[in-house]
Swiss-Prot record:
It is a peripheral membrane protein. This is Matrix protein 1. The lineage of its organism: Viruses, Riboviria, Orthornavirae, Negarnaviricota, Polyploviricotina. Residues 1-164 are annotated as: Membrane-binding. Plays critical roles in virus replication, from virus entry and uncoating to assembly and budding of the virus particle. M1 binding to ribonucleocapsids (RNPs) in nucleus seems to inhibit viral transcription. Interaction of viral NEP with M1-RNP is thought to promote nuclear export of the complex, which is targeted to the virion assembly site at the apical plasma membrane in polarized epithelial cells. Interactions with NA and HA may bring M1, a non-raft-associated protein, into lipid rafts. Forms a continuous shell on the inner side of the lipid bilayer in virion, where it binds the RNP. It comes from Influenza A virus (strain A/Hong Kong/5/1983 H3N2).
Length: 252
């Protein structure tokens, strides 16, 4: 796996699923391929994206700044600086300085990542902030190692939280989660259907599913009534795709 592929993998692991994730993936691919060289426009686009947490925006801004060639005098962006200040916690800053001293002696991506993984996400973000604000200088490989370690820490905590929700025995939470998944699946179906003539059927199925979820929420239904909702939708989607000549078995 190439270095940039690894960086893209780690960064995308902390972005919530949805159309925006696909857009960010495309931007990262363009940046890493050298196709997008307007850093200022890229940062302005990132700043105005909805849904993303300030820290995720900060990390993406850091990656774009590391990768896109820019004039030396280009101003640092406040939204990135604020996200990478470790919540203003002096302990995070102290640890970030210690980590930075270790990283300065390191030259490889994997070496930097190994060192960084023993620090908290707050300290790692602060260390990125030091480098972003030009208070510290490390090689691009080392900076990418720091980025990937930070993303791994964040993805780990997201995974723990997700696992807790999936494993919960509370029927109300499970019911709502199934309805949310069915609703997002329906949205994805509508987007994939696009504007082709054969798309009407898929759009109709998706629209009915969303209306059903809205009705279930409005009237309040038994927690078991949502069982199988998402799977039924996915079966319909796969039937539609086969007719369109698309074989995708990876949704479930």
């Amino acid at each position: 796996m190439s270095l940039l592929t690894e960086v893209e993998t780690y960064v995308l692991s902390i972005v919530p699923s949805g159309p925006l994730k696909a857009e960010i993936a495309q931007r990262l691919e363009d940046v890493f391929a050298g196709k997008n060289t307007d850093l200022e426009a890229l940062m302005e686009w990132l700043k105005t994206r909805p849904i993303l947490s300030p820290l995720t925006k900060g990390i993406l801004g850091f990656v774009f700044t590391l990768t896109v060639p820019s004039e030396r005098g280009l101003q640092r962006r406040r939204f990135v600086q604020n996200a990478l200040n470790g919540n203003g916690d002096p302990n995070n800053m102290d640890r970030a300085v210690k980590l930075y001293r270790k990283l300065k002696r390191e030259i490889t991506f994997h070496g930097a990542k190994e060192i960084a993984l023993s620090y908290s996400a707050g300290a790692l973000a602060s260390c990125m902030g030091l480098i972003y604000n030009r208070m510290g200088a490390v090689t691009t490989e080392v900076a990418f190692g720091l980025v990937c370690a930070t993303c791994e820490q964040i993805a780990d905590s997201q995974h723990r939280s997700h696992r807790q929700m999936v494993a919960t025995t509370n029927p109300l939470i499970r019911h709502e989660n199934r309805m949310v998944l069915a609703s997002t699946t329906a949205k994805a179906m509508e987007q994939m259907a696009g504007s082709s003539e054969q798309a009407a059927e898929a759009m109709e199925i998706a629209s009915q599913a969303r209306q059903m979820v809205q009705a279930m929420r409005a009237i309040g239904t038994h927690p078991s009534s949502s069982a199988g909702l998402k799977d039924d939708l996915l079966e319909n989607l796969q039937t539609y795709q086969k007719r369109m000549g698309v074989q995708m078995q990876r949704f479930k």
